[in-house]
Amino acid sequence: MLDRIIINKEPKFFITEETAMEKNKYAGTQTEKNLEAAFAGESQARNKYTYFASVAKKEGYEQMAALFLSTAENEKEHAKLWFKELGGIGNTAENLLEAAAGENYEWTDMYAGFAETAEKEGFKALAAKFRLVAAIEKRHEERYRALLKNLENAEVFERSEVKIWECRNCGHIVVGTKAPVVCPTCAHPQAFFEIMAENY
């Protein structure tokens, strides 16, 4: 649903029409279209205002930057209202699946088509950018699918082999096959643990 709202093109969904109707009581109505437009407009406004805040900050206008950011947060909440009405927020597994489907559409269809059109119209540099972003979207899809697999296999906080687990709150390290239920240092719950990434 998110992809259709943002890019106005129906992606390949992994949910049935019946499920969609249960989640979205507005399906097939003009009100649904209005909610989609409201969600898209508020989402785009939020992003624009964060970009505008960066410019104001660089130009030395802290108050204006803060107001842009404050308004962006308001727009985020407005967008969330409409997205919830559309039944667009599921549980984490559903959200990962929806996100993966959206990223798949972006790299396999949307950006590929945009690049082809830009190329035909003589915008070779832009076509190259579309292709570069498509490669990033492919990686996003892979990441969401890997996280979904971890969730489905109950491997978010436990693995069959020894791993180094790091608390995202305080940095406490645990070596073992699973993350502790509670961090022994800061008492944050297991949800704050992840497999330590050493990419430096």
Identify the residue ranges that each predicted region occupies.
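Non-heme di-metal
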Residues: 17-200
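Short, Lys/Arg-enriched N-terminal segments with co-localized hydrophobic residues
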Residues: 4-20
